[in-house]
UniProtKB/Swiss-Prot annotation:
The keyword GTP-binding does not apply. Monomer. It comes from Mycolicibacterium paratuberculosis (strain ATCC BAA-968 / K-10). InterPro entries: Cys-tRNA-ligase, Cys-tRNA-synt_Ia_DALR, Cys-tRNA/MSH_ligase, Rossmann-like_a/b/a_fold, tRNA-synt_1_cat_dom, tRNAsynth_Ia_anticodon-bd. GO terms for biological process: cysteinyl-tRNA aminoacylation. This is Cysteine--tRNA ligase.
Length: 468
């Protein structure tokens, strides 16, 4: 797709959907706050990766060259505490779980970032940023730490809407702070913890400083889009903006935030003990099915997890997969075509994936009708469009990444012929009002794991029954 229709995105800073206009025509720069690698990734972590991978794929489909940066926070209080409790070196602990996150992203075919900087690899840039803030009067030292002076930056709170009088950083009381609303840029060295030399003494970086330094290093002082979970709006992203602008730079021009994965209405988190780790989830469903599920809701919506919702997503994905395989068996090769205009309209409307998926399933229904009526050209046209649309969503069933059924194509063809014959017999029985025979045929198919749905266009069949 070379023509670029108007893309509109919800900007948290504006509190509204805005036309997206990149800094440089044809180029888009994106920074996504990545993982703090303290433990196994769960579906709440990975949802942001999937959501903004769809954004990236759509921008690429629109013809943009996309620079996509996703950082790794590999030094943090939680990492240090967990490593110490386990009797392991902190760097080994971080490296172990960084690999686990990489494996999770790869399993769900999240495109690798253009660069994936680690916090510990950019200490020099962080120190330079803090020095600039001190020189400009926006930061100060206290008891070996360095803090950002919130009152020195009058625009503080513009992203989150927090009034300065109501600010609580969640850092606890610190003796070196002039004001408890200030936040930490640098933590003074403590016995047994890693530390780096600076003009104000040894120590390690604060979380909020890390992302500013790495975003500047890879995307420059001003870039297009900053992404992350909605829980990062305050204080993390608010504090990033304050540092960058107080230092005399710009920062992100659009802020996109995804909703949480919830269970029982509560955010999925390790502290609540309600997490579903990616390795465990991949024992329950295939990676493409999990990706489909995580990407199926609007990115700004909460995604309430339930087994029923997960299985509904699996059934929907399998329905698309089976249609594409039926077309390939009956008609031949199915190459990706073009997404239909309504799909494009949906994604251009703040990545409205539910509406986009509705177009996928409408195309599947039309394609099945065409296939059953012998209109192979019409079925192929819908199948090619579906491949394009599902590819943009990152879960095209016929893509080599997800293709697991080549070896069963011949068997699927045989099943299709046999099921069609049975359904024809069932239709004859229904015409003759022989309901007992019609039910017997349907039950026989169900016992074989084949679900039959009667529609206005005739019976449709899918695999997926449990044979019970």
């Amino acid at each position: 797709m070379t023509d670029r229709p108007r893309l509109r995105l919800h900007d948290t800073a504006a509190g509204a959907v805005r036309d997206f206009v990149p800094l440089r025509d044809g180029h888009v720069s994106i920074y996504l706050c990545g993982a703090t690698v303290q433990g196994l990734p769960h579906i709440g972590h990975v949802r942001s990766g999937v959501a903004f991978d769809i954004l990236r794929r759509w921008l690429i489909a629109l013809g943009y060259d996309v620079a996509f940066i996703r950082n790794v926070t590999d030094i943090d209080d939680k990492i240090l505490n967990k490593a110490a409790a386990a009797g392991r070196p902190w760097w080994e602990w971080a490296a172990t779980y960084e690999r686990a996150f990489s494996a999770a992203y790869d399993a769900l075919d999240v495109l690798p970032p253009s660069a994936e900087p680690r916090a510990t690899g950019h200490i020099t840039q962080m120190v330079e940023l803090i020095e600039r803030l001190i020189e400009k009067g926006h930061a100060y030292t206290g008891d070996g730490d360095v803090y950002f002076d919130v009152l020195s930056y009058p625009e503080y709170g513009q992203l989150s809407g927090h009034r300065i009088d109501d600010v609580h950083q969640g850092e606890g009381v610190a003796s070196g702070k002039r004001d408890q609303r200030d936040f930490t840029l640098w933590k003074g060295a403590k016995p047994g913890e890693p530390s780096w030399p600076t003009p104000w003494g040894r120590g390690r970086p604060g979380w909020h400083t890390e992302c500013v330094a790495m975003a500047h290093e890879y995307l420059g002082p001003e870039f297009d889009i900053h992404c992350g979970g909605m829980d990062l709006v305050f204080p993390h992203h608010e504090n990033e903006i304050a540092q960058s602008r107080a230092a005399g730079d710009g920062f992100a021009r659009y802020w996109l935030h995804n909703g949480w994965v919830t269970m029982g209405g509560e955010k999925m988190s390790k502290s609540l003990g309600n997490v579903l780790a990616i390795p465990a989830m991949l024992q329950r469903v295939r990676p493409a099915e999990l990706r489909y599920y995580l990407g199926s809701a609007h990115y700004r919506s909460m995604l309430e997890f339930s087994d029923t919702a997960l299985q509904d997503a699996v059934k929907a994905y399998v329905g698309v997969e089976e249609f594409l395989h039926r077309v390939r068996v009956r008609v031949g090769a199915v190459e990706p075509g073009e997404p239909n205009p309504r799909f494009a309209d949906a994604l251009n409307d703040d990545l409205a994936v539910p509406a986009a998926l509705a177009e996928v399933h409408q195309a599947r229904a039309e394609g099945n009708r065409a296939l059953d009526s012998g209109d192979h050209e019409g079925a192929l046209r819908q199948a090619r469009s579906i491949r394009a649309m599902m590819g943009i969503l990152g879960c095209d069933p016929l893509h080599e990444r997800w293709e697991t059924r080549d070896e069963t194509s011949a068997a699927l063809a045989a099943v299709d012929v046999l099921v069609r014959a049975e359904l024809q017999n069932r239709e004859k029985a229904r015409e003759q009002r022989n309901w007992a025979l019609a039910d017997e045929i349907r039950n026989r198919l169900k016992q074989a794991g084949i679900e039959v749905t009667d529609t206005a266009d005739g019976p449709q069949w899918t695999l997926g029954g449990d044979g019970k």
